[in-house]
Regions:
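Gly/Ser-rich catalytic/binding loops embedded in alpha/beta enzyme cores
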Residues: 1-91
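Short acidic, glycine/serine/threonine-rich loops at helix termini
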Residues: 3-5, 45-49, 96-101, 118-119, ...
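Short Gly/Pro-enriched turn/cap motifs at secondary-structure boundaries
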Residues: 14-16, 64-68, 96, 120-122, ...
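Conserved active-site and cofactor/substrate-binding residues in soluble primary-metabolism enzymes
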Residues: 18, 22, 72, 89, ...
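Alpha-helix boundary/capping residues
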Residues: 30-31, 50, 101, 111, ...
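Acidic, glycine-rich active-site loops and adjacent beta-strand->loop/helix elements
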Residues: 40-42, 89-95, 99-101, 180
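Short, hinge-like loop/turn segments at secondary-structure boundaries
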Residues: 52-55, 102-106
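A short helix-breaking turn/cap at a secondary-structure junction
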Residues: 105-189
């Protein structure tokens, strides 16, 4: 309700929201300060971050690279360090793709774990609020605040957040792809 929800469509720029999304209210109740809304692929229908009349969000690594989308502005704002976390949506990759392109965490929870009430729907049965952050710990913290049952969201369900022992690790591990895997994905990776 603090800002217009345009879905990157100029025609919606005069529409005032009557209420916040459920998850935004939970964050504000916990002390989060709403900075603003970010750009996206229009109506959340793109995975590149370039389908918008409001200007393209470029990758934080190179202005010539795409940021990924559709929640491009949210991912770039976290990757640039403007905010410690941001919300987006994820129906078919709109949270995970821009997170990958900008080297941050993009958490898509199981459908119904976070209320989608107040989110402009692309596909109501698949839409999820996604969380962008620089660290898994921050994503877990935001998730623990917004993961609440919402009786007004038909998909919402009660769920108890479990501890995440994989966040606390004393050893560093990494994998090396074998020759067959490298060949499958790209000859230039060899």
């Amino acid at each position: 309700k603090h800002f217009h929800t345009t879905c990157a469509c100029p025609r919606f720029s005069k529409e005032k929201c009557e209420e916040n999304a459920f998850v935004v209210d939970r964050l504000e109740e916990a002390g989060a300060i709403l900075i603003g809304k970010t750009n996206l692929d229009q109506f959340a229908t793109g995975l590149v971050g370039t389908r918008t009349p409001y200007g393209i969000c470029s990758s934080v690594f190179n202005r010539e690279y795409m940021s990924g989308g559709s929640s491009s502005g949210s991912s770039v704002s976290v990757a640039q360090g403007y905010v410690s976390f941001a919300l987006g949506t994820d129906t078919a990759g709109s949270g995970r793709v821009p997170a990958m392109c900008n080297h941050i965490i993009g958490y898509k929870p199981t459908r119904g774990l976070l209320s989608a009430r107040g989110v402009v729907a692309a596909c109501r049965s698949l839409d999820c609020v996604s969380i962008f952050s620089e660290t898994i710990r921050d994503a877990q913290l935001v998730g623990s605040i917004v993961c609440q049952f919402d009786a007004k969201d038909n998909y919402s369900r009660s769920f108890q957040i479990r501890s995440c022992p994989w966040i606390e690790t004393s050893t560093f591990r990494f994998g090396i792809a074998n020759e067959e895997t490298l060949l499958f994905f790209n000859d230039q990776l060899n």
